[in-house]
C-alpha cells in the first residue's frame, strides 16, 4: 500500500511538490483554502507575475520531462534592466552574457499548469479546505470545508506545509516549538498597477525588466505574454513621500508626473487603479523550526523573503528538487532523517537569499543609475570574461547557476572587497577602459582568488 502524504497549499510550491512526490510512488493529496484557480482569477493583492530563472527551470525539468518547456511557453524573456531616469531617458543593463535571461511568467497561468500536471498524475486536490486544527498528541491535522465538514489526517501521517508566508501549518507548529518565528517587516509597501497592451507604445524594449529608480523608492514593470505589463510601485508606508501621503487624485497624479514623467501615457486610469489595488506590506520570515517528526515546512512557509532578487519562487522550487534528491538518496524512507537533512541543507541558503534580496532592493532603488556602480559592473563583466569560472558575478551565480545561495553570498563579499580595491586606483573612473587598467584589475583580482 502506498504511503499517503498530505500537502497543505496548492500554490506554486505545493503543486510542484505534489508532482515530485507522486512520481516517487507516494499517494498525494493537497488541501487548499482557495477555490480552484483554474475556475477563478488570481487573488487580489498577490503578485500576478514573477521571475523564473535557472533554479526554477531546473526544478521543473527534474520534476517531469518537458514541464519546463510547457512553463516557458507562458513566459517572456528579460535580458536585462531598462533604467528610466527622471527625464525619461532609458538605458539598458544586461543581466549577463547576451544569451542569458530571466523570464517573466504569470503566477496564475503557471499555477494552473502545475495543478493540472499533478492532477493528471493522480494527485487529489481538495479546494476550499482550510487547515483548522492540529492535535499534537496524535500528530493529526484537521481540514474543514466551507460547509463545516472536517477531514482528518491519519495519526502521524506526513504533512508538508506549503501554505505560503502566512502559513497556518507554521503557526500550529510554533505553538509546540521554541523559538518563535520572527517577522522582519520593511517600512515599505507595494502596489501593483496594470499597463494595458494598448498603452505600451512608448515602451521600446519589451524583453527587459523596466525600473524607475528614485533612491528612496522605485517603480518597476515586468512584461506579460499578451503584451501588457505588470507594474509595481515600492514606496515607504509613511513619511513625506509615502503611500500615506497619496490621499487624493491630485496627490497621485502630481507624484507620478514629478517622479515618473514618461509613464503618463501608460496609466490613463492611474487614480482608479491606485484606489482599487491594495497596498501590501513587505516582510521576511525567519524561522528555525521547519519540522517535527512527521511535519515539514517548505517554500515561503519556511522562509518567506522580499521579492527584490526575483528568487522567492525559484528558492521554493529548488526546495522541492532538493527534498526529492534527499528522498531518492535513502534506501528506506526515514522522514525524521529526511527532514533534518533538508533543514541542514536549506536553512543557511534560505537565510542567504533573504539577505541578498534585501541588498538587491538597495541596489535597484539607489545604485542602478549611479556612475560608480555602473563602472563596477563593467569591471565585473571584464573580470568574468577574462577569468571565466574563477570570477563569476554574484547575480550570475544566483540567477543562472545552481551554486548555493550561501556560496553566492560569501563569494559576493569577496568580490566586493576586490572591487573596492580596484575602485581605489587613482583616476580609474576617468581612464577606464585602457589596456593598462584592464591588466591591472586582473592583477589585483588574482591576489584574492
UniProtKB/Swiss-Prot annotation:
Catalytic activity entry: L-kynurenine + NADPH + O2 + H(+) = 3-hydroxy-L-kynurenine + NADP(+) + H2O
Entry-linked InterPro entries: FAD-bd, FAD/NAD-bd_sf, Kynurenine_monooxygenase
Pathway: Cofactor biosynthesis; NAD(+) biosynthesis; quinolinate from L-kynurenine: step 1/3
Matches recorded under Pfam families: FAD_binding_3
Protein's GO biological process: anthranilate metabolic process; kynurenine metabolic process; L-tryptophan catabolic process; NAD biosynthetic process; quinolinate biosynthetic process
GO terms of molecular function: FAD binding; kynurenine 3-monooxygenase activity
Cofactor requirements of the protein: FAD
EC number: 1.14.13.9
Key words of the record: FAD, Flavoprotein, Monooxygenase, NADP, Oxidoreductase, Pyridine nucleotide biosynthesis
Family the UniProt entry places it in: Belongs to the aromatic-ring hydroxylase family. KMO subfamily.
PANTHER family: KYNURENINE 3-MONOOXYGENASE (PTHR46028:SF2)
Physiological role: Catalyzes the hydroxylation of L-kynurenine (L-Kyn) to form 3-hydroxy-L-kynurenine (L-3OHKyn). Required for synthesis of quinolinic acid.
Protein name per Swiss-Prot or TrEMBL: Kynurenine 3-monooxygenase
Source organism: Cytophaga hutchinsonii (strain ATCC 33406 / DSM 1761 / CIP 103989 / NBRC 15051 / NCIMB 9469 / D465)
Name of the encoding gene: kmo
